[in-house]
Regions:
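Short, P/G- and charge-enriched loop/turn segments at secondary-structure junctions
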Residues: 40-41, 184-191
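Short amphipathic alpha-helix that is part of the acyltransferase structural core
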Residues: 4-46
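Short hydrophobic/aromatic beta-strand or adjacent loop that forms the aromatic wall/cage
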Residues: 196-201
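Acyl-donor binding region in acyl/amide transferases
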Residues: 21-24, 49, 67-187
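Conserved beta-hairpin
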Residues: 34, 48-68
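Short beta-strand-to-coil "C-cap" segments at the C-terminal boundary of structured domains/repeats
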Residues: 202-206
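A short, polar/charged loop/turn motif at coil->beta-strand junctions and beta-hairpin connectors
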Residues: 16, 28, 60, 80-82, ...
Length: 206
């Protein structure tokens, strides 16, 4: 219901993807949009480096977040330094967009990253648990690198969280939400879900 209330904009039928604008943005602008349109419903815990918005006539119709890899030291598999590697952390658009909207959006950000940063490779994951196999990545010349090992998520309310969310600390003290999740697991209000491996995709910027 939230997304219908906040984002009831419909792309005019005569619009083509090349009519859309991709703009550098920030998390404050896209937070509510992502929490409404991305399957994770969350940006909690993301380390964020670059944020982009996709616009049609100044209406936000898509959002994308890039940041360091979520798994500690995972960058070593792809680059010589952590700054070589950037992960596409979130991508979502409103439902009613023309064909190829997401691939157009990704392509624009790929070119921006190549021109404006020193990153050498983009890594992204297609979440098989949510039925994603990476069609959009294959359409934008990403290379399929295999699967991650199976994992597990914490289901709490209508959202899921990585199991590392219960271990996040600030100055050696559990963050409030981490403690809240732990309490929910103990009370039975939250539970673990076993998940299949995610599809790994990479795109070389240089």
């Amino acid at each position: 219901m939230l997304k219908e209330l906040l984002y009831d904009y419909k792309v005019p039928l005569d619009k083509k993807v090349t009519d859309f604008d991709v703009k550098v943005s920030n998390i404050q602008v896209v937070r509510d949009f992502i929490q409404s349109w991305h399957y994770s419903k969350s940006v909690n815990g993301l380390r964020i480096s670059h944020v982009f918005g996709l616009y049609c006539d100044d209406n936000l119709i898509g959002a994308m977040i890039y940041g360091p890899l979520g798994m500690a030291n995972a960058w070593r598999k792809y680059g010589e330094s952590e700054s070589d590697v950037i992960e596409l952390r979130r991508l979502c658009c409103i439902d009613e967009t023309p064909k190829c909207t997401e691939s157009y959006f990704i392509g624009k950000t790929q070119r921006w990253l190549k021109k404006n940063t020193d990153h050498k490779i983009i890594v992204s994951y297609a979440d098989a648990y949510h039925g994603h196999t990476g069609v959009i990545y294959r359409a934008t010349n990403f290379k399929h690198e295999g699967l991650t090992t199976p994992g597990r998520l914490i289901k709490y309310g209508d959202k899921t969280y990585h199991d590392k969310a219960i271990r996040t600390k600030y100055k050696n003290v559990l963050k409030p939400f981490a403690q809240k999740l732990r309490d929910a697991l103990e009370s039975g209000d939250a539970h673990y879900i076993n998940t299949p491996g995610k599809h790994i995709y990479t795109f070389r910027l240089r």
